[in-house]
Every structure is written in structure tokens, then in C-alpha cells.
């Protein structure tokens, strides 16, 4: 049933976007739009107020799989676990989806995972956590991650510019850097999130929760990547901003 509900929500979003395009792009009044569509102005108001926002399409149609790494323990029993910051990022993603009428389907990413699940997906995973993270970054023509000088960096593949986590500076600063890409893959969307540390991933979601609409208006349905710096109070993100991008592919 979730699939059908998500399709219905997407159809409502498309109706709302078409109405707004006619109003803003063509200069029609809502009364004129209602007349052209053969519906009442009240129905137009209902569509505008009740349908999901246009930026819902950033993540696809839904339901959306939301994956985080399953890490290997280092104690005697070698139990697998999910990092607290990764779990918080997964929860932040689900919270954001709640504002967009998107259904989330959480999953874990074992360390040997190389295949992206079918359908719309948010992969919260760095290149060192699983092959799926490394492969997605490898296919990004603009940004990636490299290990140099004993630490990890986000790299602009075209210029060689490096963006490191302030938390690994000497002295360390309460901040981190995260990576975000969004790509159209046939009839689905793959969003990839990765931090230099796991807190960097949460910084990406902090930014999306506050700037998704403006980012979607800038990038539309194009594939792109960007880097985000976030300020931290322990594991809590207090601010976030773009430091590179968005770079359209």
C-alpha cells in the first residue's frame, strides 16, 4: 500500500507544481487557472495547501530506502553495531521525509555491500565503510574523498582543492565536513551522504532540513555534488553551510 500512497502524493505534488508554474511563470491568476482546469478556485487553494512541496522530488517518488553502515565491533565478541551519529542521521532523514510526505524504509549496510538497493535510495556511507560508498564517489566526476597526510579529505577532482574536517586540525575545532550527491539513475534517485567523520553526515541533513527548497530550485532534476561544513556542540549540529558546489554533472 505504501507504494500506491507515495504515487498519489507525487501526483498531488505535480498538480501543485503545475498550478504554481502557471501562476508564476505565465502570470495567470488562481481564478483563471481554476477556470482553465474546470475546477473551483477553492479546489485550487486546496491543492496548493494540501499537496507536498515541489522539493519532495529531490528524493524521488518514494518510498525511499535510507541506509547506514553496519560497523564491525572490536571487542572480544566482535558484535556489529550502528554508530550513534549515523543512527541520528538516519533519524534526521526520516524526520525530513515526514515534512515531504515521503515514506522511509531504513536498512543497514554491511561492510561488504557494493550494490545499491532498487528504487529511490539515500545512502549514508563513506568510502571506507563499504564498497557502495567508494563506488558511488568514484562515479562522481566533481567531488570525492581521498586519504592524504594521515587524514581524510573531500577533494575537488578538477582543481585538487582539499576540504578537511576541522575536528582533525591541530588544535581540533568543533566542526566537520560532509559530502552530498544527488543523481538521477533511470527512473529513480540516488542520494549519497558521507562525512569525514559520521558527524559530517549529520551536518548534511542539518543543511537539507533548512535549505532543501532553495537547493532544489537551483539544481532541479540535475545530478550534482557539494561539500558542507557544519559546526558542532558534541554530536549536535548548530550550523551548516556549503563550502563547495553545487557542482552540476
Describe the role of every protein-language-model region.
Residues 29-35, 44:
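Short alpha-helical "recognition helix" segments of helix-turn-helix
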Residues 31, 52-249:
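Solvent-exposed alpha-helical segments and adjacent loops
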Residues 11, 19-28:
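Short basic helix-loop element that most often maps to the first helix and adjoining turn
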Residues 1-18:
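Short, Lys/Arg-enriched anionic-surface-contact patches
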Residues 43-45, 58:
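Boundary/activation segment at the start of structured domains
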Residues 5, 51-52:
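Cysteine-dependent phosphatase catalytic core of the protein tyrosine phosphatase
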Residues 23, 37, 48-49:
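DNA major-groove recognition helix of helix-turn-helix
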Amino acid at each position: 500500500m505504501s507504494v500506491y500512497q507515495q504515487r498519489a502524493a507525487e501526483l498531488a505534488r505535480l498538480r501543485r507544481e503545475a498550478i504554481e508554474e502557471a501562476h508564476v511563470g505565465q502570470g495567470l491568476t488562481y481564478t483563471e487557472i481554476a477556470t482553465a482546469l474546470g475546477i473551483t478556485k477553492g479546489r485550487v487553494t486546496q491543492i496548493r495547501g494540501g499537496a507536498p512541496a515541489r522539493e519532495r522530488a529531490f528524493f524521488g517518488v518514494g518510498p525511499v530506502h535510507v541506509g547506514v553502515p553496519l560497523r564491525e565491533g572490536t571487542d572480544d565478541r566482535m558484535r556489529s553495531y550502528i554508530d550513534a551519529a549515523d543512527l541520528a542521521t538516519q533519524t534526521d532523514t526520516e524526520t525530513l521525509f515526514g515534512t515531504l510526505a515521503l515514506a522511509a524504509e531504513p536498512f543497514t549496510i554491511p561492510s561488504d555491500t557494493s550494490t545499491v538497493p532498487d528504487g529511490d535510495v539515500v545512502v549514508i556511507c563513506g568510502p571506507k565503510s563499504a564498497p557502495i560508498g567508494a563506488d558511488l564517489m568514484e562515479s562522481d566526476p566533481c567531488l570525492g574523498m581521498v586519504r592524504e597526510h594521515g587524514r581524510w579529505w573531500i577533494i575537488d577532482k578538477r582543481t585538487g582543492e582539499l576540504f578537511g574536517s576541522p575536528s582533525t586540525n591541530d588544535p581540533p575545532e568543533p566542526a566537520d565536513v560532509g559530502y552530498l550527491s544527488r543523481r538521477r539513475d533511470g527512473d529513480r534517485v540516488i542520494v549519497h551522504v558521507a562525512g569525514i567523520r559520521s558527524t559530517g553526515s549529520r551536518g548534511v541533513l542539518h543543511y537539507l532540513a533548512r535549505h532543501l527548497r532553495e537547493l532544489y530550485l537551483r539544481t532541479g532534476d540535475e545530478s550534482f555534488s557539494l561539500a558542507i561544513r557544519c559546526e558542532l556542540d558534541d554530536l549536535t549540529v548548530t550550523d551548516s553551510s556549503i563550502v563547495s558546489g553545487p557542482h552540476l554533472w
